[in-house]
């Protein structure tokens, strides 16, 4: 969950700074107890632990039309190309983390509410460890899961 929070905040900050491309790569283990995120010299490209959770999250954002694309680079980093309107405003207006490590929120597919007249999406975690959006959950025979975040 911390990985997803880092990814959400990095995307928010990149859109505020109107960056087109983000690069995410794994962090280095400094010692047994400390883990630090390795940043580039200019500190413009945040680096976050790349996991299947990040990959699935980017896949959902791409399928729903919130980003232009994403790919894995040769060094193992994740490259995300953000999408902007012609006026220069980011397509993603708001990203909100719902479930937190200390306070998990679960819901069934019938109880998922439509925020902002259905313009946003809610991202859920299934019992198999996959991420799906609320539209996929209502189309398939999905029982319920943990609500991770909402994207508008």
Curated annotation (Swiss-Prot):
GO biological process: translation
Pfam family membership, one: Ribosomal_S8
SUPFAM superfamilies: Ribosomal protein S8
Keywords recorded for this protein, A-Z: Mitochondrion, Ribonucleoprotein, Ribosomal protein
GO terms for cellular component: mitochondrion; ribonucleoprotein complex; ribosome
Keyword Lipid biosynthesis: no
GO terms, molecular function: structural constituent of ribosome
Record's keyword annotation contains Ribonucleoprotein: yes
Subcellular location: Mitochondrion
Domain of life: Eukaryota
Family from the record: Belongs to the universal ribosomal protein uS8 family.
UniProt name for this protein: Small ribosomal subunit protein uS8m
Species in which this protein is naturally found: Marchantia polymorpha (Common liverwort)
């Amino acid at each position: 969950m911390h990985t997803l929070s880092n990814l959400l905040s990095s995307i928010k900050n990149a859109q505020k700074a109107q960056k087109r491309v983000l690069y995410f790569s794994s962090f280095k283990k400094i010692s047994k107890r400390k883990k630090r995120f390795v940043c580039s010299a200019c500190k413009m490209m945040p680096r976050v632990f790349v996991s299947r959770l990040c990959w699935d999250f980017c896949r959902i954002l791409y399928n729903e039309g919130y980003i232009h694309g994403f790919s894995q680079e040769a060094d193992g980093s994740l490259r995300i190309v953000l999408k902007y309107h012609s006026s220069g405003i980011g397509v993603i207006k708001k990203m909100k983390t719902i479930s937190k490590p200390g306070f998990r929120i679960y819901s069934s597919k019938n109880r998922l509410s439509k925020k902002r007249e259905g313009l946003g999406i809610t991202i859920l975690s299934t019992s198999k460890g996959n991420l799906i959006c609320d539209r996929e959950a209502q189309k398939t025979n999905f029982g319920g899961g943990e609500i991770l975040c909402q994207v508008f």
